[in-house]
Design a protein with these regions (language model features):
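C-terminal outer-membrane/trafficking sorting elements
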Residues: 268-320
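Solvent-exposed strand-loop boundary residues in beta-sheet-rich modules
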Residues: 150, 177, 262, 305-307
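Short loop/turn motifs at secondary-structure junctions and domain boundaries
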Residues: 131, 228-234, 291-293
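Glycine- and acidic/polar-rich repeat regions and solenoidal domains
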Residues: 1-208
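Surface beta-loop-beta hairpin patches that serve as ligand-binding interfaces in beta-rich domains
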Residues: 208, 216-267
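Residue-level structural signal for beta-strand termini and adjacent loop
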Residues: 126, 152, 231, 253-254, ...
Length: 320
C-alpha cells in the first residue's frame, strides 16, 4: 500500500483510541500519526502523543458521524513534500478534513467533525498545511494551540466554505509571521507566545515540554464545550480531563491546548539564542560556546526533516 498511519479506523463504531504514542510513520500517502478513514461513527482520538509522522497529525475523511481529535500533542508531524510540488494534495498537513469516501468522483460529507484542545509544535524545517475541503459537512475547530518555529518556509492554510458549516474559534497561532492564516481561522484567535514550558525550537520529544507556564495567555482562554451529560456526545461533553490528567470544567472556559493545569512558574531549562560553534580545521569536531553560561551542555542532532539522530554531552561535539 506504500503507506500506513500509526492507526486508523475504517467503518468502525464507538471507538476510543487513547494514551498511545504514534511515531515515525513514513510513506507517500496517509502516514499520519493516526487517521480517521471513512464510514465511522463515534470515534475519538484523545490523550495521544504524535511525533515525526511524515503525512501529518490529524486526517479525517468523509461519511463520518461524531468523529475527531481532542487533547493530543503533535510534534514535528507533516514533513512530507508533494512529489509534484502541488499545494493541497500530498504535502504534509497539521489538520486535514476531506469528504473522500472510497470512489471518485463520489463525495460524502460528514456530521459532527471535531478537532479541539490539541497542542501542535512545528519546527523551522517543516511547513505542513492546514486544509479543510469544500462540502465536508459541519466542522468544529476549537481551542487548538499551534506553535511554529520562527524561521523557515511559510505554513499555508486554506479553509473552504462551499457547502460547509464551519465553527472555528478560540485557537492560538504563534508565530503568525510564518503562518499564512486563512481569515476563517481568525475568529476569537490568540496570537501571543503561549509560553511553552520548554520552547526549544527543534522540538523536544517529551510531552511534558508542551505544558504552558502560569502566565501563558492560553490559560482560561478557550471556548467552553458543554451541554450534555452523555460522554459520547463529543461536541457537548469535553471529557472532563486533559492530556496530563488535569480536570476540565464543564462550566468554565478551558485553556487553549492539551494542557489544562494552572502551569508551573518557570521553564524546564535555560534558553539562550547566543550560541557559537567553532569548527576545527584539523579534526572532525566543533566547539560550542554559550554566552553567560558555564554549566553542562547537551546537544541533540536532527536531520533537516526533524528526525532525531543522536545526542552528545559536553562542549566538544564530534562530527564522526
Amino acid at each position: 500500500w506504500k503507506r500506513g498511519s500509526g492507526m486508523w479506523t475504517f467503518d468502525c463504531k464507538n471507538v476510543v483510541a487513547q494514551h498511545n504514542k504514534f511515531m515515525n510513520a513514513h510513506g507517500p500517502m496517509d502516514s499520519y500519526g493516526s487517521h480517521i478513514d471513512y464510514g465511522n461513527e463515534n470515534v475519538v482520538f484523545q490523550y495521544n502523543y504524535s511525533f515525526n509522522n511524515e503525512g501529518g497529525f490529524a486526517e479525517i475523511l468523509g461519511d463520518n458521524i461524531n468523529c475527531g481529535y481532542r487533547y493530543n500533542i503533535s510534534v514535528n508531524d507533516g514533513y512530507r513534500e508533494d512529489p509534484n510540488g502541488v499545494s493541497w494534495d500530498k504535502k504534509g498537513k497539521i489538520f486535514w478534513v476531506s469528504n473522500y469516501c472510497g470512489q471518485n468522483p463520489i463525495r460524502c460529507p460528514s456530521v459532527g467533525t471535531f478537532i479541539y484542545n490539541n497542542t501542535v509544535f512545528v519546527n523551522d524545517t517543516l511547513n505542513p498545511e492546514i486544509y479543510i475541503w469544500p462540502d465536508v459537512g459541519d466542522v468544529h475547530l476549537y481551542n487548538n494551540l499551534v506553535v511554529v518555529g520562527q524561521n523557515g518556509n511559510v505554513i499555508s492554510t486554506l479553509i473552504e466554505t462551499d457547502s460547509n458549516d464551519l465553527y472555528i474559534s478560540h485557537n492560538l497561532f504563534y508565530d503568525t509571521s510564518r503562518i499564512d492564516l486563512d481569515n476563517k481561522l481568525e475568529n476569537n484567535s490568540v496570537y501571543e507566545d503561549p509560553l511553552l514550558l520548554n520552547s526549544v525550537y527543534l522540538g523536544e520529544n517529551d510531552p511534558a515540554a508542551y505544558r504552558i507556564q502560569s502566565n501563558s495567555p492560553a490559560i482560561n482562554s478557550g471556548f467552553l464545550i458543554n451541554g450534555s451529560n452523555d460522554s459520547t456526545k463529543y461536541l457537548e461533553h469535553n471529557g472532563g480531563l486533559d492530556y496530563f490528567g488535569n480536570s476540565v470544567s464543564h462550566h468554565l472556559p478551558s485553556n487553549i491546548g492539551a494542557f489544562n493545569g494552572s502551569g508551573p512558574m518557570q521553564i524546564l531549562e535555560q534558553k539562550t539564542n547566543d550560541i557559537k560553534l567553532f569548527p576545527s580545521v584539523t579534526y572532525d569536531y566543533v566547539s560550542i560556546s554559550i554566552k553567560n553560561y558555564s554549566g553542562p551542555i547537551n546537544t541533540e542532532i536532527y536531520t533537516l526533516k526533524g528526525d532525531f539522530i543522536n545526542s552528545q554531552n559536553g562542549k566538544i561535539l564530534s562530527l564522526k
